Amino acid sequence: MTIHHDLRPTLNLIRLANGEGLDLPAYESKGAAGMDLRAAVDEAAPLTLQPGKRALVPTGFIFEIPEGFEGQVRPRSGLAFKHGITCLNSPGTVDSDYRGEVKVLLANLGDEAFTVERGMRIAQMVIAPVTQMRVAESAAASETTRGAGGFGSTGV
């Protein structure tokens, strides 16, 4: 089924000076859930990530995520599989009221140094709906069949 009406919310991006010349974050296939984020590192000074080390990598953009949504920063499977490069704090949450540059906390879990070059696709962002709950304190938890069983209590 094809839907001909574009009712998707708009994601406004503000390009920062270090993002000049970079492609906009984009969905790389028709069915992609996440848009790829690119590294806004200095072209003359790529970032080399040694094994076991981590670094905060700029994207060059501020994301104005609509209220009622969040941005989830996630690893790219190819970088993880081929090089051991992943995102710490994954998924990292970008709140709708955050107005700073989106950065990616990359870690090298591989055995070799990895060079992050300008414009390289380093992570993906999934925009997802969120619900803020009304919080109330209760004297006791309600009864369920499962009860307090956790961490494998329903089987492995």
From Swiss-Prot:
Encoding gene, per UniProt annotation: dut
Cofactor: Mg(2+)
Iron is among the record's keywords: no
A Gene Ontology biological process term: dUMP biosynthetic process
Listed pathway(s): Pyrimidine metabolism; dUMP biosynthesis; dUMP from dCTP (dUTP route): step 2/2
Species this protein is from: Rhizobium leguminosarum bv. trifolii (strain WSM2304)
Catalytic reaction annotation: dUTP + H2O = dUMP + diphosphate + H(+)
Positions that bind substrate: 76-78, 89, 93-95, 103
Protein name per its UniProtKB record: Deoxyuridine 5'-triphosphate nucleotidohydrolase
Key words, A-Z: Hydrolase, Magnesium, Metal-binding, Nucleotide metabolism
This enzyme's EC code(s): 3.6.1.23
SUPFAM superfamilies: dUTPase-like (SSF51283)
